[in-house]
Amino acid sequence: IGAASVFGQKIQSNNYGTTGYVNADGKIQDASYRTVGYIKSDGKIQDNSYRTIGYIKSDGTIQDASYRTIGYIKSDGKVQDASYRTLGYVKSDGTVQDASYRTLGYAKGVDKTWAAVVFFFFFFNG
């Protein structure tokens, strides 16, 4: 499935403020280094209590905890909802944009699938 290329890559807002971190082991932390969840190498998405809250399939399909498809992450970085409406894009340089190409933030060095899960599917927004 994906991985952060370097331990502790920053997730940043569009004004470069740090909003969190994605570690190479899949741990997702907020800006205060509190663990908010995990993305496992098998695609399982877990909250901070290790409860499974979703799945990333090898083909880029994103599912909720009940295996309902909620979106897709295409190989080119396009992110779509379950109805194939474009939500945004994760560019190869880590820039994350909405469907109108406005920059939402940055996830440089973070696998685009993981970045899409954090920015578009809100698994870790409590």
PLM feature segments, named:
Residues 2-35, 41-43, 51, 58-60, ...:
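Long terminal segments
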